[in-house]
Amino acid sequence: MLNLRAIARQAMLDRGFIVSLPEAAQHELNNAAEPRFDSAGIRDLTSWLWSSIDNDDSRDLDQIEFAAKETGGTRIYIGVADVDWFVRANSALDDAAQHNTTSVYTGVQTFPMLPERLSTDLSSLNEGEKRLAVVTEMLIADDGRVTESTMYSAIVQNKAQLTYDAVAAWLDEEPGAKTPQRLLGNGDLQVQLKMQDAAAHLLRERRHEAGALTFQTTELRPVVTPDGTVVDLQAHVHNRATRLIEDLMIAANEVNAGFLEQHGLPSIRRVVKTPARWDRIRALAALMGGNLPEEPDAVSLEAFLQQQQRTNPAHFAELSLSVIKLLGRGEYMMKVPGEEAPGHFGLAVQNYSHSTAPNRRYADLLAQRLVKAAQVRTNSPYSVDELSALATRCTQKEDDANKVERLVKKCAAAAMLRSHIGQQYEAVVSGINADGAWVRITHPPVEGTLEGAAKHLDVGHRVHVRLVSVNPERGFIDFALISS
């Protein structure tokens, strides 16, 4: 019987991850305790109607939100768990987190960057618990501009732990959708969510005017019985609530980067460089009647994507996958104040960091430490060389984590497809190199190797393929080309 949990654990080890907490870190964890809430200068915001929105099964809650309408716009507050209070720089817990740099979500088992006693308890913004947080405050004007912003430490309390699917159904007023339990009879919380949704929409509209790219993406999660049998592959797509949180977090990340720049501290930026394969993106657009300029231009690409989403929605997920592949991966880079650095091409922002998930990503924990240094006007706790090395480490381990997650999902998909050998599918070429090509079918949304790939194929080409073999233990899914 296929044991996906064993496969996931071995994949973690093969990629150099720590899967068991080292003894010294365990000793520190055993002595971890609730923080004292009497520190001078820390604001007490526990009376506010904070709420969180996350996945149904999320237990590591990194951020909560609050909104207040005022003249000139909506003031948004993002409270991010103060993980640094528990995980001090250069401690054994910090060393373990720095080694892995990220939580890994395989769909059958989560390998948290920080032990669960911290990430799902003491440093998680769980409902009803008083917690320390680093708050990003920003005023969103009616045209979507962030006209004021600051950051500070505070005591907060999550009043309502909500989920993406339930909030999205409620916001969209879907027929038959049940009002989330926390919203029943709670008019103030309903007003809160609608204010946050409206502010997020303004932010999103302004970013898309600047060239932020519209995509339709799908996350595949295996459904496994208690005995480890794969019974289904569920596709989860972004909805209104995920976009709400995403838009607020993007704005908070921009504020974080600007805050450190303003205070003269170096930072770790999240960048997606100008795409090297713009020529192929242009060629794809031309096949669909689009006309992109010779030089990379996010505004033109976004206009084309929106037009395709309206006129050809059935194939927009395919197009999204192809363009995402051609844009290239994101990476972390150290930035010194005053120096130019690449921006994030896909989000159409120049100054961007990761800062809102310190329980899950080490880059965010580093950002939190830098912000706290800026708040008390001290020097950076890291040298430029140290930050540069840590940025490289975070990029490398993120790539490793993606490969672990992808392998486990491919093993699950191979198990599901075992009875479909010989079946034919419509597919799109999702990757290509000197060794061959990869294709992705739509139902289920699974990627596999294309045997004997023709040299004329490139990312985005539609092909007709036959499933010829699978190996669930190794995650191999092989297709043969029928026509292109």
Segments predicted by a language model, with ranges:
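Electropositive polyanion-binding surfaces
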Residues: M1-E451, K455, V459-G460, V470-I477, ...
